[in-house]
Amino acid sequence: MTTIDTASETKPFQAEVAELLNLMVHSVYSETDIFLRELISNASDALDKLRYESIANPALMADGGEPKIRIVPKKAPDTLTVIDNGIGMDRQELIDNLGTIAKSGTKSFLTKLTEAKDGAGLIGQFGVGFYAAFMVADSITVTSRRAGSAEAWTWSSSGGAGFEIAPASEEAAARIERGTEIVLHLKPDAAKYLEAYQIERIVSEYSDNIQFPIELVPEDGEPRQINSASALWQRSKSELTEEDYKQAYKQVAGAFDEPAMTLHYRAEGRQSYAVLLFAPSTKPFDLFEPERKGRVKLYVRRVFITADADLLPPYLRFLRGVIDSEDLPLNLSREMLQNNPQLAQIRKAVTGKVIGELDSLADKQPEQFAKIWDAFGPVIKEGLYEDYERREKLLSLARFTTTAGEKRSLAQYVEAMKENQTEIYYLVGDSLDRLKANPKLESAAARGIEVLLLTDAVDAFWTSGGLDFGGKPLKSLSQGEVNFDLIPKLDADKAEDKPDEAKADEATVIAVIKDALGDRVSDVKASQRLTASASCLVAGGFGPDRELEKMLARANKGAATKPVLEINLGHPLVAALADTKADKADATDLSFLLLEQAQILDGELPEDPAAFAGRLNRLVLRGVVAHG
């Protein structure tokens, strides 16, 4: 025969209370609003447990009404009460669940679920989150009746060394047919939590998608539901319409446009989680802020945890939406978020899924994908520099403006490559118009070779990684040597090279220029890039591309190395340097002019603009170019 203990008893906490409260207030939670989220989450867990146990024992649902959560503020005295009609707790469960930090109200229950391989959505961490209420309460009274039990019990504590457990008073027991009533005796500075608008604000922000109704019970009015009680991402795609997704996007993202892409799925297996992500159709104003923060919200069992969990890599920070885990604990601190292996697995899987969805969209709805790329391509390309594992997939997604006049994929580029062309050519700059006029394109254009024109700031970085696509390396037209000898010009009869005549003066001209310019350039070479212009500047064969060097120098992250000056031996200005009638002063002016006009064509100013203007005036007045 079992004897019911009806005596009141004071018990110590298994964990020292001051240390416990310090953990809650300082280590885990930074805002006091969180206490209500935790209590609502616990109530939701209790309702989940009741729903699960009632499958095997329907009588548990016989009394107590439909599952719901009630919040009751009272200003005389200052108490805030949270009530659920869930599974409830008996005496020992109150001691076990609320007497320690080490054991939560659902741990033993989870053991049963694990053995049954079912009900993962019932995971909870009741004991830990409950103590967050001491941030706003001087004392807490909990009265609970286990579903199907005749006894109700009251647990109470003022946050000292322990707690009291006793049979519930007749009045308290009468209020609770099943479930739990938590009464917070608020601190004076927490009186704001008695205001209806404050309660509604917190519920809207943190608990709107709890699947059970949350009712606010005012002192002078009728109870009313204050949450939507519908986690759309937990529903099947077959139940939802396009309009449902549009409305969800506006609620989740706080946006006014329509989504350009929607990704909704549920992952099952080692981890269970629901994903609902949207790509906006317009670019947010803070897309390129230095912090590069994402805007995907983390939920755990429909309870909002944070919007700052780095759930996706920075190059996907334009996405908006929700990831709702069934397995993560609710008490995730910032450090835990950064180091949690389960979260890392979710991030990896969801990132792969997003890239796959973008690839599918590019294939099946190219016009819709083009909208996303036009808005967020510069951000996605950051992944080419940062995400080595997915670089090839991201390269396949990328779209580039080219000299062919349209945005193309690298697959399209490779398909259109000229016979004997072995490299994918590109040019980086800060202006599309300036790139189109860049003299480094001349020889490629004469052969009909397509060139990628890259103008986003990130382009100078990701192209420095020595990438290839389909076995074809990417090659900058502003770095190192280029050789188009095996690719004929489009009109070979009109534009035949005369190498023997050109090479006759090559050594002389180069010697004159080197003597004049000294260490302003690292070398002077005859160009294979130029057909019409006199000169251009390129980077050497090793090290960063010229555009990246300039960017780093502007950011004071390194001095740009001396460029290589390439000259067109067939240009009259260059030929004038070999003219025996040209004196040293003219040769110096011509040499500097070749350097300075190349700088201007690259978007730079001459080192000494006044000296440049003087040289140009002298050459015009002397008619050197005309008679050269």
From Swiss-Prot:
Q: What is its main location?
A: cytoplasm
Q: Where is this region: C?
A: 551-628
Q: Which cellular component terms (GO) are annotated to the entry?
A: cytoplasm
Checking Gene3D superfamilies in the record gives: 3.30.230.80, 3.40.50.11260, Heat shock protein 90, C-terminal domain, Histidine kinase-like ATPase, C-terminal domain
InterPro entries reported in the protein's UniProt record = HATPase_C_sf (IPR036890), HSP90_C (IPR037196), Hsp90_fam (IPR001404), Hsp90_N (IPR020575), Ribosomal_Su5_D2-typ_SF (IPR020568)
Q: Where is this region: B?
A: 335-550
Q: Which domain of life is it from?
A: Bacteria
- Keyword tags: ATP-binding, Chaperone, Cytoplasm, Nucleotide-binding, Stress response
The answer on whether this UniProt entry bears the keyword Disulfide bond reads: no
Q: Where is this region: A?
A: 1-334
Q: Where does it reside?
A: Cytoplasm
Is ATP-binding tagged as a keyword?
Answer: yes
In alphabetical order, the GO MF annotations are: ATP binding; ATP hydrolysis activity; ATP-dependent protein folding chaperone; unfolded protein binding
Q: Where are the transmembrane segments?
A: none
Pfam families, alphabetically? HATPase_c_3 (PF13589), HSP90 (PF00183)
Assembly, in brief, is: Homodimer.
Q: What does this protein do?
A: Molecular chaperone. Has ATPase activity.
The molecule here is called Chaperone protein HtpG
Query: Per the UniProt entry, what species is this protein from, by scientific name?
Result: Rhodopseudomonas palustris (strain HaA2)
What gene name is listed for this protein? Answer: htpG
